[in-house]
Design a protein with these regions (language model features):
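Bacterial N-terminal signal peptides
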Residues: 15-25
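Outer-membrane beta-barrel porins/channels
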Residues: 30-47, 51, 104-453
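Intrinsically disordered, low-complexity boundary segments flanking structured domains
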Residues: 21, 30-33, 63-68
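Small-residue packing motifs within transmembrane alpha-helices
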Residues: 11-17, 177
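N-terminal secretory signal peptides that target proteins for export/translocation
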Residues: 1-11
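Outer-membrane beta-barrel translocator/receptor signature
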Residues: 54-63, 68-143
Length: 453
């Protein structure tokens, strides 16, 4: 469940939380739509498998802290890149909109430090962007709202979300074939939305349409647990678990309901259309369980594979919205209070993510990599909008790495193949997105550099 205090509509906050999958700008957390596949360039190039990976401080702090044991010398890694999203939104009334969104990734950093000599412990620190989004659509607002004739004309529909995780971890190696790890830290969450929205269930305002501008931020604790087993010198098996993260954020929600009030006629058209509320948002990030394996098939050839389970069904089942301390006396009078609650359906499905990849040592310090990821979209058609189209199913990636002495660099290109989803009958109130379709594709490039010292 996702709870929002002081936004003004299910569709609005649904857009904020879910649209992250549109940009695909998310490091960590290992989801195939709303989260990116891998936090560093090597992981991304291998399909996002991190549970069994070793030798990367960023990957260990992103998914499986047990992998810190694979660090033989202190190592610092930094990763940065950019994403390019293209999309198309078509509506049955002839509206056709295009999305062109380019954004830089907030850099990720990881530090791994082995403990004292002859003591089997390694420490790690990670600062990793778990979610990054800047989805920016522009299209004509469909007729709707109370009375069915309200439109705000051509409008920007923009949602931004950031979840930045800072964590401190440690791994112990009680036996040469076994590593255990855990990390603790905090996730900083920032949300913003500017778009038309419709109240979904508020008894007095259900169906009422207005413009919304919302901004909130907050912090919550986060944890990771992991294990790696090495049954032979050529095989590494890993498993990790991330409990759900509940983040309470505070901010403001403001808007303008002029078009809706004008459509209702006197006396509503004479009312001040502007409003402001204090915003308190409760966001729940799903629990994630991952398993994976690496196999050194030949001296130069390695294969990896992994599976993730993401519990979206419990985290994004519905959206509870509470508005408080409203500034507009007329709206407060109609509602009977300066606060209100609205509930919107999300009904996301649990997701299974399948990952596979291979890397080949070319020689001269160079390594070539390729990967593939598949996951059925967690977003059901009946609640999808252009801002929530985290619908990618297939991703392919290719990368190259170079290592010389204490230094290494890895580069990856990841392509989210074009995905299209059609909405038959939307269950969002007013049905503005019924008989609509969204097509999206994305390209991501990331560079990771590291140094041992």
């Amino acid at each position: 469940m996702v709870t929002v205090h002081s936004t003004a509509n299910g569709r609005a906050w649904l857009a904020i939380l879910a649209a992250g999958g549109l940009l695909l700008n998310i490091s960590a957390a290992n989801a195939a739509g709303l989260f990116l596949d891998g936090a560093d360039a090597r992981s991304m190039a291998l399909g996002g498998e991190e549970a069994a990976q070793t030798g990367s401080a960023i990957a260990a702090m992103d998914s499986n802290p047990a992998a810190l044991s694979g660090t033989l010398r202190p190592e610092l890694e930094i990763s940065a890149g950019g994403a390019f999203l293209r999309g198309e939104f078509a509506r049955d009334d002839g509206e056709l909109a295009h999305l062109r969104s380019n954004a830089a990734l907030i850099p990720a950093a990881g530090l791994a430090i082995p403990g004292p000599r002859n003591f089997p412990i390694t420490f790690g620190i990670g600062v990793i962007p778990e979610m990054m989004l800047d989805a920016n659509w522009r299209y004509r607002d469909a007729l709707g709202g109370l009375g069915g004739t309200t439109t705000y004309g051509e409008q920007k529909n923009r949602s931004r979300i950031l979840a930045l995780r800072t964590s401190f971890g440690a791994a112990i190696e009680p036996a040469h074939w076994l590593s255990l790890g855990a990390s603790v830290g905090f996730t900083y969450n920032q949300n913003a939305l500017f778009a038309p929205y419709i109240f979904q269930s508020q008894p007095v305002l259900a169906g009422f349409k207005t413009l919304l501008d919302l901004n909130t931020d907050g912090v919550a604790p986060c944890y990771d647990f992991g294990v790696q087993i090495r049954p032979t010198s050529k095989i590494t098996l890993g498993a990790s678990y991330r409990p759900r993260v509940v983040i309470h954020t505070d901010g403001t929600a403001s808007g303008n309901a002029s078009a809706q009030l004008k459509a209702l006629g006197p006396p509503f058209s004479m009312v001040n259309p502007n409003f402001t509320y204090n915003a308190e948002v409760r966001t729940e990030l799903p629990q994630i369980a991952s398993v994976g394996g690496e196999w050194q098939a030949l001296n130069r050839l390695r294969f990896v594979a992994g599976v993730d389970w993401i519990n979206w069904a419990d985290a994004f089942d519905e959206l509870n919205i509470h508005l408080s301390n409203g500034s507009n006396a007329a709206i407060n009078g109609v509602v009977g209070s300066d606060s209100m609650t609205d509930i919107a359906p999300l009904r996301w499905r649990d997701q299974w993510v399948y990952r596979t990849g291979a890397e080949y040592v070319i020689g001269g310090g160079f390594t070539a990599r390729a990967g593939y990821t598949y996951a059925r979209s967690a977003v059901p058609p009946q609640t999808m909008t252009p801002l929530t189209a985290a619908i990618f199913d297939h991703k392919v990636s290719a990368g190259v790495g170079y290592k010389k002495g204490r230094y290494h660099a890895d580069l990856v290109w990841q392509w989210s193949l074009p995905a299209k989803q059609h909405v038959g009958r939307s269950i969002l109130l007013d049905g503005e997105y019924s008989d609509a379709s969204v097509l999206v594709t994305a390209h991501l490039f990331e560079l990771t550099t590291g140094v041992e010292f």
